[in-house]
Amino acid sequence: MSNVGTTGRIPLWFIGVIAGIAALSIVGLFFYGAYSGLGSSL
């Protein structure tokens, strides 16, 4: 297996890690905003 399956120079696992961190950050900010009372505007 070569790097044909990957998107360009970026490994697929790296994209998965970044997407996971971004998703956790968005969910964390949403729950933090809802807990502090600022998430009610969303």
UniProtKB/Swiss-Prot annotation:
Gene Ontology biological process terms, A to Z: photosynthesis
Pfam families given in the database record: PsbJ
Compartments reported by the entry: Plastid, Chloroplast thylakoid membrane
Primary residence: plastid
InterPro entries: PSII_PsbJ (IPR002682), PSII_PsbJ_sf (IPR037267)
Keywords: Chloroplast, Membrane, Photosynthesis, Photosystem II, Plastid, Reaction center, Thylakoid, Transmembrane, Transmembrane helix
Membrane topology: Single-pass membrane protein
Keyword Kinase annotated: no
Transmembrane helix in keyword set: yes
Domain of life: Eukaryota
GO cellular component: chloroplast thylakoid membrane; photosystem II reaction center
Positions of transmembrane segments: 10-30
Family: Belongs to the PsbJ family.
Quaternary context: PSII is composed of 1 copy each of membrane proteins PsbA, PsbB, PsbC, PsbD, PsbE, PsbF, PsbH, PsbI, PsbJ, PsbK, PsbL, PsbM, PsbT, PsbX, PsbY, PsbZ, Psb30/Ycf12, at least 3 peripheral proteins of the oxygen-evolving complex and a large number of cofactors. It forms dimeric complexes.
HAMAP family, A to Z: PSII_PsbJ (MF_01305)
Function: One of the components of the core complex of photosystem II (PSII). PSII is a light-driven water:plastoquinone oxidoreductase that uses light energy to abstract electrons from H(2)O, generating O(2) and a proton gradient subsequently used for ATP formation. It consists of a core antenna complex that captures photons, and an electron transfer chain that converts photonic excitation into a charge separation.
Protein name per Swiss-Prot or TrEMBL: Photosystem II reaction center protein J
Taxonomic source organism: Zygnema circumcarinatum (Green alga)
